[in-house]
C-alpha cells in the first residue's frame, strides 16, 4: 500500500512539474532579464577580442534602419562562448531580437520586441489592400510636415490599431510618412523620458538616444525626434 501511495505521489509531482514548466518557460521567453543581456554582452566582447575587433553579427543591407542593422548572430557565439541563446531570444522561441548599437566605438547589446514587427506587417498588409483599390493611403490628419495620421475606418478597422510600448507598457499609435511607410509614434514615451533626462539633450538633436542610453530597448520602426519647448516633436 505504501509503495502504491509513493508511486501516486511521484506521478502527481511529475504532472505538476510538467504543468509549471511551460508557464516558467513562457515567462522566461518574455522577460528582458538583465543577466541575459549581460551574458550576451560578455560573449560579444569575448568574440570581438578573439577575432580582431570583428563582431558576431548578421549581414544586413546598408539601407537597413540603424536600430535593426546589427542583429547578433548567435551561431557565432554558441556554444563556445555561451551554451545557448537566452530563453527570451527569438532564436529560442522568445519575443526579443538581440542587436548591437554603437558598433564603432562601444558595441552594446540591446533588444527589439519582435511582436512590434508583426503588428507593423499586419497594418502594412491592410494598407496595401486599400491602396490596390484607391491608389493613395487614407490620410486623415497632418501631424507635421510629411507625417500623417491614417483614417483607419476607411481601412476596415473598428478600433484604432496600437502597439504596446516596451518602455512604459502604454499603447502607442502609428503614423505614416509621405512615402507610405508606417512607423510607431513614440512621443508619449519620449515625453516621459524628457521629464527624467531632458537636461541630456537639446533642440536639434535626435532624442531617441535617450531610449538607447537608459533602457534595454531600441526604438525600432521610428522616425527621428527632437525636443522643442520641453516636448518631443518629429525631426527631419
What are these regions, as identified by a protein language model?
Residues 1-5:
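Positively charged n-region of N-terminal signal peptides that target proteins for export
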Residues 15-18:
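C-terminal motif of bacterial Sec signal peptides marking the signal peptidase cleavage site
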Residues 20-23:
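Bacterial signal peptide processing site
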Residues 27-34, 38:
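Juxtamembrane membrane-water interface segments immediately C-terminal to a transmembrane helix
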Residues 36-52:
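N-terminal alpha-helical signal peptides/signal-anchor transmembrane segments
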Residues 57-131, 138-236:
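Extracellular/periplasmic head regions of type IV pilus-like filament subunits
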Amino acid at each position: 500500500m505504501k509503495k502504491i501511495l509513493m508511486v501516486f505521489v511521484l506521478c502527481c509531482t511529475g504532472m505538476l512539474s510538467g504543468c509549471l514548466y511551460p508557464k516558467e518557460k513562457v515567462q522566461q521567453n518574455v522577460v528582458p532579464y538583465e543577466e541575459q543581456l549581460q551574458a550576451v554582452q560578455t560573449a560579444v566582447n569575448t568574440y570581438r577580442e578573439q577575432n580582431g575587433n570583428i563582431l558576431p553579427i548578421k549581414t544586413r543591407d546598408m539601407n537597413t534602419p540603424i536600430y535593426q542593422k546589427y542583429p547578433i548572430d548567435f551561431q557565432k557565439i554558441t556554444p563556445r562562448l555561451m551554451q545557448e541563446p537566452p530563453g527570451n531570444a527569438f532564436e529560442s522561441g522568445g519575443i526579443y531580437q538581440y542587436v548591437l548599437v554603437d558598433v564603432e566605438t562601444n558595441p552594446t547589446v540591446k533588444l527589439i520586441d519582435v511582436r512590434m514587427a508583426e503588428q507593423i506587417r499586419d497594418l502594412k498588409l491592410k494598407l496595401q489592400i486599400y491602396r490596390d483599390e484607391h491608389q493613395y493611403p487614407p490620410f486623415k490628419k497632418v501631424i507635421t510636415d510629411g507625417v500623417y495620421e491614417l483614417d483607419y475606418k476607411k481601412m476596415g478597422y473598428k478600433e484604432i490599431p496600437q502597439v504596446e510600448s516596451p518602455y512604459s507598457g502604454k499603447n502607442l499609435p502609428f503614423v505614416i510618412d509621405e512615402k507610405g511607410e508606417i512607423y510607431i509614434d513614440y512621443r508619449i514615451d519620449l515625453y516621459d523620458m524628457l521629464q527624467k533626462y531632458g537636461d541630456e539633450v537639446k533642440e536639434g538633436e535626435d532624442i531617441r538616444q535617450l531610449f538607447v542610453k537608459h533602457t534595454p530597448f531600441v526604438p525600432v520602426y521610428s522616425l527621428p525626434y527632437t525636443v522643442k519647448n520641453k516636448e518631443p516633436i518629429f525631426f527631419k
